[in-house]
Structures are given as structure tokens and as C-alpha cells.
């Protein structure tokens, strides 16, 4: 129970510490957090109109494709979801990750002179195209857990795209990067005409209108409206509009034009996929995450390792505390680089990676006074896995880290809780500028 004094400190700030300007915020309809205030506003509009957390999450995920195009992601991207239904107590992971194109085989890349998959930016970036999974996943959430129509959840993003949003500093900083300009020049049309003002970076606060994106969103919404009051049929035809109709045709043609591997057939065969989340326990809490088709288990592995340290005794954010947490994360990331992959396609010792005994062995590697240079050696989770008898794949990780670890840019995230206790979150990513 929080007493009156504690409540005051939470709301006004502890006067014995520097003020943060971030008091506790209370609400009655729900809470939403995202990477941009207009993304959050899209979801809050849905909550105030009577929608649930899942409706709001879908609305905000579509809105983020308009409000954060240079920052994080686009409709040509992917997303992972974690969903908790208060009524049933069900927790589900949902993959909106794009699968590889049918053309993307080792033999194909070798025939092009590549012994690893080339990623963007660059002339060979189209060879790394995957199926855009985020749209299918959003409609899957709306279909299974939502209450509102396609038009309801797409209206905020349509308005943002057609009427414009204010340009903001982070997005403009990305536009100033030479690789953004070169990518637009390499893959016309669209980028330079939409995001630049006669070749110059716009001023903060100027209007960014994305009419073509608005047209795609409106086309899906209108397709759903054509089904009348049948909400589920509306969702199905909106999904087909993107993956089987004119939009899929345009994506296939555009991919072919730039030498990409993605075809309309790849889109037609795509399905977002639900799965059971993986989990671990930490100090009495059960913590859930997606499996190794994401990097979600990194957090769970790190928590398992950190159970072997008295973080409270070390003191929050003391040098020793930060050192210990950092080293635990590095051990988990080393395993990520070596063993993570989609269990549907490659053998992964998921149970071994999340084994408490394995974590105990890894925890012993942390030197209390010295940081490991770069990433440490990956471990041997196969020893702790029920699949030990399987042939363990040879890790492709090299000591010293991968280029991905040097990236400064990240992605975006959306979390929603409604008044019924439903909780939903999404991490849409990729398909935007130098990430594509």
C-alpha cells in the first residue's frame, strides 16, 4: 500500500534528489507510450472512443509508419508483438517478421558473388528484401483481439499522411545524413520529392505530407468498408488488398525494377504467426519474451545471470552495478550472435539458453573489477538443452562483435494498457531509409 507521503514523492518528485520533471501520470481510460506523441495520440483516440488496448496498438502501429518514417520503420517492415488478454489470462507472442523471399537461397547469393547476405544501404540492398510482415500482423491482432473496424484504426494514420505532420528534429537529422540522400537518389521515385524541399532539408515544424502513403492506407480502409458491417470480412479484404491485390502488384514491380528478390507470390504466401512466449523467473516475477526469432531472450538470459548478484547491495546505477549489468548483457549478446535464429528453420537450444544452470555457469565468468573487451566467448547451451543429441550448428559469430553492434540508430516501440487490464506492445522496425 502506498502511503500519502510516498504518493506525494511519486507525484511531485523527491526533493532530496534532482527533479526529473516526469511525475507519475494517472488515467482512467488506459495508458499508451510510444516513440512519437502523434503515434501515442492515435492510440489514445481509439481508447477514448471505446476501443481496447489491441485496437489502440494497431492504430498506433500504423500511425508510426507515418510519424516515424526516417526514425524507425515503414509499412515495408516487420514487427514483433506481445499480447496479454485480461479476460482469458492468455499471453501470446506474434511474429510480424518478414520471411525471406523464395528466391533467397544460399545458391542464389553465391551465384551473385555473395557469401553473406548484403544489407542496405547500397546497390545490392534489394537482395536482402524480406516480406513486409507488419501489416498482416496488425490485422491479425485486430481480428483476434480487437473490437473496432479497419476504418476506425486506420483513420488517424490516414489523416496524418494526407493532411501532414510537423517535421521534427530527429527525423531531419536523419535526412541530413549523406547515406539517406544517396539512397533516395539510387532508388527513385519518392524520397527526395516527399522528404526534401527542392533538394534542401526542411525546417523543423514545416509540414510533411505523404499523399501516396495515405493512399495505400485509404485503399485498405475503403476495401474493408465495402464489406459493410461485417468487421471480420472487412479485416480479411484489407489484408488481401495489401498482400494479394494492387498493392502487392506494386511491391513486386518495384522490387523487380531495382533488382530485388521479392515477388508478389512471396506476399501472397505470407502469414503472421502466433506462438507461445518463452519465459523465465526473476526474484519472484515471471518475465515473458518472444523466442529466438527475435533477440527477446537476451533480456531473459541476462536476468538469469543477474540472479547470482546482489544488485540492491551494489546500489542502483553505481559503477559496480552498471559494470555487472553490462557484463551480463554482453554474455547474453555473445550467445545471441552465436545461436539465435528462427526455430522453425534452424535448430536452436532455446531451453539451454534459458537454463538456470547454464546461467550460473555464465555468471562465474563475470570479473567484478575488469570488463571483457568487446563481446566475450559464447557459451555451450547445448549441454543444458533437451536437444543435446542433435547436431549443433557451427556458430557464425566471430569474436569482437558484429557490425550491427556498432549501429547508433534503433527502432521504435509501442506499449498500451487499457482499463480492463489488457496489455499489448509492438516493436515495429526496418524498412526505413538506411535500414532498408
Where are these regions (language model features)?
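Short helix-capping/linker segments at secondary-structure and domain boundaries
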Residues: 143-148, 224-226, 306-313, 336-341
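Extended C-terminal regions of large enzymes
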Residues: 289-297, 402, 417
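Short loop/turn segments at secondary-structure transitions that flank enzyme active sites
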Residues: 87, 100, 293-295, 308, ...
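Noncatalytic scaffold domains of N-terminal-nucleophile
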Residues: 2-41, 45, 53-237, 242-294, ...
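Internal maturation/activation junctions in enzymes
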Residues: 9-12, 199, 248, 252, ...
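A short, polar/charged loop-to-alpha-helix boundary motif
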Residues: 104, 432-436
Amino acid at each position: 500500500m502506498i502511503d500519502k507521503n510516498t504518493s506525494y514523492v511519486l507525484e511531485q518528485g523527491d526533493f532530496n534528489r534532482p527533479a526529473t520533471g516526469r511525475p507519475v501520470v494517472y488515467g482512467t481510460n488506459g495508458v499508451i507510450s510510444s516513440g512519437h506523441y502523434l503515434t501515442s495520440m492515435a492510440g489514445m483516440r481509439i481508447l477514448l472512443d471505446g476501443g481496447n488496448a489491441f485496437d489502440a496498438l494497431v492504430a498506433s502501429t500504423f500511425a508510426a509508419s507515418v510519424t516515424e518514417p526516417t526514425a524507425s520503420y515503414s509499412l515495408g517492415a516487420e514487427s514483433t508483438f506481445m499480447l496479454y488478454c485480461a479476460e482469458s489470462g492468455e499471453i501470446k507472442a506474434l511474429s510480424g517478421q518478414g520471411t525471406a523471399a523464395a528466391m533467397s537461397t544460399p545458391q542464389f547469393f553465391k551465384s551473385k558473388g555473395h557469401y553473406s547476405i548484403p544489407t542496405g544501404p547500397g546497390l545490392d540492398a534489394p537482395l536482402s528484401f524480406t516480406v513486409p510482415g507488419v501489416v498482416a500482423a496488425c490485422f491479425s491482432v485486430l481480428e483476434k483481439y480487437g473490437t473496432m473496424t479497419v476504418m476506425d484504426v486506420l483513420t488517424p494514420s490516414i489523416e496524418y499522411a494526407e493532411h501532414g505532420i510537423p517535421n521534427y528534429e530527429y527525423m531531419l537529422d536523419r535526412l541530413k545524413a549523406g547515406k539517406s540522400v544517396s539512397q533516395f537518389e539510387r532508388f527513385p521515385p519518392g524520397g527526395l520529392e516527399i522528404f526534401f524541399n527542392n533538394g534542401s532539408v526542411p525546417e523543423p515544424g514545416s509540414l510533411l505530407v505523404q499523399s501516396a502513403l495515405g493512399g495505400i492506407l485509404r485503399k485498405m480502409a475503403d476495401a474493408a468498408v465495402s464489406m459493410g458491417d461485417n468487421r471480420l470480412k472487412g479485416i480479411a479484404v484489407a489484408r488481401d488488398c495489401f498482400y494479394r491485390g494492387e498493392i502487392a502488384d506494386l511491391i513486386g514491380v518495384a522490387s523487380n525494377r531495382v533488382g530485388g528478390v521479392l515477388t508478389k507470390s512471396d506476399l501472397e504466401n505470407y502469414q503472421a504467426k502466433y506462438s507461445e512466449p518463452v519465459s523465465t523467473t526473476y526474484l519472484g516475477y515471471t518475465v515473458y519474451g518472444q523466442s529466438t526469432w527475435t533477440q527477446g531472450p537476451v533480456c531473459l538470459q541476462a536476468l538469469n545471470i543477474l540472479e547470482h548478484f546482489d544488485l540492491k547491495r551494489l546500489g542502483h546505477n553505481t559503477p559496480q552495478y552498471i559494470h555487472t549489468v553490462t557484463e551480463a548483457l554482453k554474455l547474453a549478446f555473445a550467445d545471441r550472435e552465436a545461436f539465435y535464429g528462427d526455430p522453425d528453420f534452424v535448430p536452436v537450444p532455446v531451453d539451454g539458453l534459458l537454463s538456470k544452470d547454464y546461467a550460473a555457469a555464465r555468471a562465474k565468468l563475470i570479473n567484478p573489477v575488469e570488463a571483457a573487451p568487446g563481446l566475450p566467448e559464447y557459451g555451450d547451451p547445448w549441454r543444458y538443452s533437451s536437444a543435446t543429441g542433435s547436431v549443433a550448428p557451427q556458430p557464425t559469430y566471430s569474436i569482437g562483435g558484429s557490425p550491427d553492434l556498432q549501429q547508433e540508430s534503433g527502432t521504435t516501440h509501442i506499449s498500451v494498457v487499457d482499463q480492463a487490464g489488457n496489455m499489448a506492445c509492438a516493436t515495429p522496425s526496418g524498412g526505413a531509409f538506411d535500414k532498408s
